Structures are given as C-alpha cells and as structure tokens.
C-alpha cells in the first residue's frame, strides 16, 4: 500500500494550501537533522519534504488524489486504452534540503532561520543575513505551469511575489508585493528557464537572490507533447481499423483536420502528420509533427452469424 502524504504532514485530504504550508513549516523545523538529535529525524525530514513536494503542486496532488501513489509514480494514461501513451511518473529528487531551502528562501537553517535564542525568523525569497561581506543569496527556483495553448500561441503571465525591501534607514526591511511579467514565446519547451536577476529579498549585507521560473507543462485533455511533436490517441472500432477510415483531429488553433487512413490499423500502427505539432522556439513559423495513435476497441459480444462471417472473411 502506498504511503499517505496527508498523514505524513498530519493533515486531512481536504486541507487548503495554507494548511499544507503551515504543516510543512512546523514539521520541517521540528525534524530538521541539525535541529533534532533523534536517529529517525533524517528519514522523517525526507518524508515530510516528499509529501510537501507533491501536495503543494496542484497537478501532482490531483493525480495523487485520483490515482494514489502508484498512479503518481507509475504514470497514468492520457486517455484510457490498451495502446495509450502514458504520462511520465513522478520521482522525488531525494533532496529534502532543497525543498527546505526553496520554502524558506535560505540555505543554512540555523544561521538564517533561527536567532540566537532559537526563535524562528520569517523569510521568503532569501533571508536577511548578519553583518559581514556581501554575499548573494542562493537562487530561488519556482515552477511556472503553462497549458499547451499558452505554449502554442505564446502569452503574457503576471506573477505576484512577496519579498523583503530595505527601508530608507538601509537596515530594517518591509515585506512588499511586486508583479513580475513573463512574456511566454511560442514553442517554449518544458524546462525553459526565465531569470529575474536580484529580485529576491533585500538586506543590508546581502545581494538579493535571482528568481528563476522553470516552465512546466500542464496535462492536456487531447494531446501529449514530446519535444516539438504532439501525440494524439484516437479510439477506433475494430471494423474501421480493418477497413479504412477518416480521423478527425481538432488542433490547438481550433482547425479540424480530416486525416484519411487507407492502411489496416494494427496495435503498433501510427500516422504521422507533418507540420501539425508545436512551433519551433528558434523559428515559430515552423512546426513539429502530429503523431496519431489508435486505441482499437474490440466488440464484447458477437452473434454466431457474425463469427461465421468473420471466419469466412479472415481465415479463408
């Protein structure tokens, strides 16, 4: 039986984002290996990080809630059927300190997250550090989830961040919101990085961290993307698979393609449609290809007469 991420964080399945963050904050500070002397702290700290990594991500949480840990880590089909391409399974990166750092915005939990008396210090995008040589805070990475339509046409995303801004005295700071604008270009691929230099927390003795957004693709109801190509799964009755057909595909730009199939469609068959994939980032006027796969639907019952007709047609 898969592990229960909600139990790991001590929350219920209907918990909201704020409750998930609060639970992770409390448990991570309690079980951090540099804070706790318990032998089990390292493993608990890792489990807490993995649970938060999943539940704080709407897409991962949605898959986990519906399909459990097995579906999350093993992958799920975009459309159910025997020949359906599957999503890539989730793998925890195994670095709980990375989750801790990204959550609090610093690297050393005891120099930046606790004062001399052990009280917590609130941080966001990199923390205020003590006096000394100016040093830039470690870069902060955030996922930027985009739909295939966003990546096909391009779009503009405005993201609000909260960060510490130095006051006029040059020492104290105030948390203020700022809007960052990202101009998404047609054809951007998953993993594209957008860097906002020195937009992290300000402090008297630090250089603000760079904030980096990393493009992640949302699941799409019709297509799966592979590099610059699109995969489409078309359900088809066995009769049409054997006797030719025309496939209709509604594209991302809302055109209806009518693709004639004159071959016998077998389980490993696919149809390539050149130039109907995603725009190429280097030249958006050019596109990748569309690959059509088929989910052959077999009948569940046949009358004796139909069986005899099939024998005569296929076995003689």
Curated annotation (Swiss-Prot):
Disulfide bonds: none annotated. Residues 4-68 form the J domain. GO terms for biological process: axonemal central apparatus assembly; chaperone cofactor-dependent protein refolding. It is linked to Ciliary dyskinesia, primary, 34: A form of primary ciliary dyskinesia, a disorder characterized by abnormalities of motile cilia. Respiratory infections leading to chronic inflammation and bronchiectasis are recurrent, due to defects in the respiratory cilia. CILD34 inheritance is autosomal recessive. GO terms for cellular component: cytosol; motile cilium; radial spoke; sperm flagellum; sperm head-tail coupling apparatus. This is DnaJ homolog subfamily B member 13. Homodimer. Component of the axonemal radial spoke complex 1 (RS1), at least composed of spoke head proteins RSPH1, RSPH3, RSPH9 and the cilia-specific component RSPH4A or sperm-specific component RSPH6A, spoke stalk proteins RSPH14, DNAJB13, DYDC1, ROPN1L and NME5, and the anchor protein IQUB. Interacts with SUN5. Interacts with IQUB. InterPro entries: DnaJ_C, DnaJ_domain, DnaJ_domain_CS, DnaJ_subfamily_B, HSP40/DnaJ_pept-bd, J_dom_sf. One of its GO terms (molecular function) is unfolded protein binding. The keyword Chaperone applies. SUPFAM superfamilies: Chaperone J-domain, HSP40/DnaJ peptide-binding domain. It comes from Homo sapiens (Human). It holds the Pfam family DnaJ_C. It is found in: Cell projection, Cilium, Flagellum.
